[in-house]
């Protein structure tokens, strides 16, 4: 994990018991009991589902060599096995983090996020809609606007209030900030088939 860019700002001293342990495993990968989700991004086919004792995630890149991870039912142990290509490992860590932190009212969101007047604003939309372009325009035209994360910030509910955190997963823009802000707004972007102001 130390080879993955973006994680250094989030490193903490090991004073407390960690939320979960990442373990390189030599055990046999469990079998899916129930498939929950399958998708393909950039030729990488991913499967997510349940096995007998928890959750299983498998990535199959076009060049071969799968990366498999499975989380125990209590989500305290994340087992990794297979192809440790950094691109695969980064995404697998994102999945593991999401599953392990879900019980703590935490979720990663696909969005580009700015901070303006000490509050976070999320710009949501399908890939290619213009989320990053929109946050860039805010930074260029609205004084005090700064980028918090350009791909996958973390939303967490604390005492009934939504907070947004920077994360190690910021897409193509290297913006890894260990900061948090209250949520001011969520803006859903859609793209028209024409240009008009």
What is the predicted role of each segment?
Residues 1-122, 126-127, 137-146, 154-197:
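A noncatalytic interaction/capping subdomain that flanks phosphate/NTP-handling catalytic cores
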Residues 131:
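Conserved lysine of the Walker
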Residues 134:
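Hydrophobic positions on the alpha1 helix immediately C-terminal to the Walker A/P-loop
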């Amino acid at each position: 994990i130390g080879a993955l860019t973006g994680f250094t700002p989030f490193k903490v001293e090991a004073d407390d018991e960690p939320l979960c342990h990442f373990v390189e495993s030599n055990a046999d990968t469990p079998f899916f009991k129930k498939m929950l989700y399958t998708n393909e991004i950039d030729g990488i086919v991913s499967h997510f589902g349940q096995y007998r004792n928890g959750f299983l995630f498998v990535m199959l890149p076009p060049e071969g060599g799968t990366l498999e991870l499975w989380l125990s039912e209590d989500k305290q142990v994340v087992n990794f096995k297979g192809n440790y290509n950094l691109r695969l490992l980064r995404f697998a860590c994102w999945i593991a983090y999401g599953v392990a932190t879900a019980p703590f009212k935490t979720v990663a969101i696909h969005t580009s996020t700015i901070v303006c007047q000490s509050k976070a604003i999320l710009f949501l939309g399908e890939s290619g809609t213009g989320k990053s372009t929109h946050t860039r325009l805010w930074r260029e035209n609205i004084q005090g606007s700064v980028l918090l994360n350009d791909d996958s910030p973390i939303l967490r509910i604390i005492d009934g209030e939504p907070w947004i955190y920077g994360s190690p997963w910021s897409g193509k823009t290297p913006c890894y900030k260990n900061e948090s802000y209250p949520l001011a707004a969520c803006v859903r972007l859609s793209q028209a088939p024409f240009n008009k102001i």
